Amino acid sequence: MGRLGDILNNYAKQNPVRFHMPGNKGKINFNISTDVTELFFTDNLYNPDADTGIIHELEDKIVKCFFPNANHIHSIISCGGATLCIQAAILSLLRFKNNLSDCGQEKYLICDRASHISLINTLALLNITPLWIYSDDFIEFIEDYSKIYGNEILGVFVTSPNYYGRIKDIKAISEVCRKYSLTLVADNSHGSHLAFYSSGELHPINAGADISVDSVHKTLPALTGAAVLHTNKKFDKELLLRSSMRVFASTSPSFLILQSIEAMIEYLTAHGYDGHKVLLENINQFRNEAEKIGFAFDYFSTEPYRIVLSAKLSESSDNINSGKFLYDYLCDKNIFCEFYDSDSVILIPSILNTKNDFDVLLDALRQFASKYKFYSQPSVKVTEANISTNSVVSINLSQALKLPRKKILTDNAINKISAEAVSFYPPGIPIILPGELIDENNINYIKQIREYIDVIDM
């Protein structure tokens, strides 16, 4: 076995408490002998056979599992993660809007600026101009953009929930989208499990979105790369979406991922609602006990399962990252979380996390509290806060990706045009985009990420 295999096997052997993706928590196994290519009896994921019915049957089960009381919903499987779903959704909007008379005209997409890098790359590939929304006031922005750009707008793209568990008012956004006949796409990558919360009202499809991108591997028991694209009756374009997916997808989808989705649906059909109810009880009990010993949680997080744990060290200075300090401490206790920022640690639990996992976590936090001085400070920091709202776009996204580039020291990049998107990953929200002018307001942030940066060679 090579080095990577050794590292991963050693991690698995130490039986870690996993509060990171994927949602399977290392508890599902598949025989590699079932990893095959498309054969006459396996069906073809991106061009399924209506007669064989294997893929369609599985997708129908997904609909019934996620939306048992809904009608006219299609679910399309992706083995290329949420990125492939986003690519397919945006290309479908473009194809749906385009016709021979206006296909050469500029097209726009109203977008949440705190969108994942996969959306940025998709816009660049398809030469679509983003109309950014920088605040939570989506309604006003959609109204204003619609009045200015009219029929040239392809639709609206929102991220909900985000990495920090902050959910947007999809119902209100969908209502204004209907007013202007705009298709609403929700990047629900971090909220697939919300279909099993209460009556499912927090899932974007149930809240009014036309298309939802569910990266099921993040919070549900499936293999990494498993995702599902849901669409409702307003954008009832299953064949168009599937055709668009074929443009970007590998012609060799993973049948191991497909099997994991099938196993996930079987598990969720039996345990989805009850299991998530128990998980929420464990999370709420953990929150209550952690608060008693001085820890705080992000009060902006409205996603009931996401844990944003804050502990600002009393002796903290500019040279001490409180979030990293707590993250590293938990790693030493064999507890591995998703990521950290300057003040917080983000944990992603799933239905496969046990009560014992939370007990072990709480015990570690009690030890931390007895050893270090810190004060409660609910996290208000988000990566999006570093995004400039007045960035100068010198070259559009599509052109910026195609032009010659050179690598220079970040210190020397002021007033240069970025040739790449720069972001911490996770959460993958770019602080600066290809084609934007690098200024002093974001240079210090960029220096935290990388010493060198690609700029347009002009």
What are these regions (language model features)?
Residues 45-50, 64, 77-78:
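Asp/Glu-centered strand-loop micro-motifs enriched in Gly/Pro and often flanked by an aromatic residue
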Residues 291-437, 445-451:
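Conserved C-terminal alpha-helix-loop-beta "cap" of PLP-dependent enzymes
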Residues 453-458:
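Charge-dense polyanion-binding interfaces
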Residues 36-45, 64, 125-126, 130-132, ...:
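Gly-rich Lys/Arg/Thr-decorated short loops/hinges at beta-loop-alpha junctions or inter-strand turns
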Residues 1-53, 182, 427:
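N-terminal "arm"/small-domain region of PLP-dependent enzymes with the aminotransferase-like
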Residues 26, 163, 218-219, 234-236, ...:
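Short, glycine-/Ser/Thr-/acidic-enriched flexible segments
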